[in-house]
């Protein structure tokens, strides 16, 4: 019974205690933040002004093309005949028989006469020899003496006279000296050099009248202007004076033939004796065409 009362008192006390207790204050629920403020309205769209079209510029007119001029009719090229039907070039006569070139457009007067054959040959020969330097002629002096003594480039026989032995001994020395000097001369000058020493030997053996008559240097042989008959007989030039050389002072046809024969022998003998190459032609530089031996 007491126990029941104790429990009843405890229940009453607990009930009163609970009644007196204040309830927990309700904490207000925090309001969620307001959404972002609404953005202002976009700018009012202003209407674009009506675009005015660009003024069309007139296209400049292109210039009229040049009037086409008709080409003149072309002349056809003249057809040349085949080479086997063409006329051959006129063959030139030998060096010693060439005639002077005269103009064909105007006839020459009767007073103008062509050069004599001997004078023409002699003048052309001097024009050729003048290209040989004097030192070359001095260098070939043993060859000149060898030709002057009419030496023969053959071995000396065993049984000969004493005078002939001396001559052959001298010729042998000259032959050696000549063959030492001839190869030292440039090949393009060997022909003119041999011809020059033969010509000097020939002049020494001729009469004094011929020697005096051929002392002229360069002479004008060909007309300077085409179409004018200016081929006149050149005058020999002497130092300090000018005089006429007689016709008899120049080479005669038989002398020309003799000189050419002697030159031909020398041009065959010296190269073979010394085993050197000598051109068998000569070039007259600046005077007419090339002339062969």
From Swiss-Prot:
Residues 25-81 have a biased composition (Pro residues). Pfam families: Gliadin. Residues 1-19 form the signal peptide. Keywords: Seed storage protein, Signal, Storage protein. Developing endosperm. The keyword Amino-acid biosynthesis does not apply. It comes from the Eukaryota. The keyword Zinc-finger does not apply. One of its GO terms (molecular function) is nutrient reservoir activity. Residues 20-90 are annotated as: Disordered. Belongs to the gliadin/glutenin family. Sulfur-rich seed storage protein. This is B1-hordein. It comes from Hordeum vulgare.
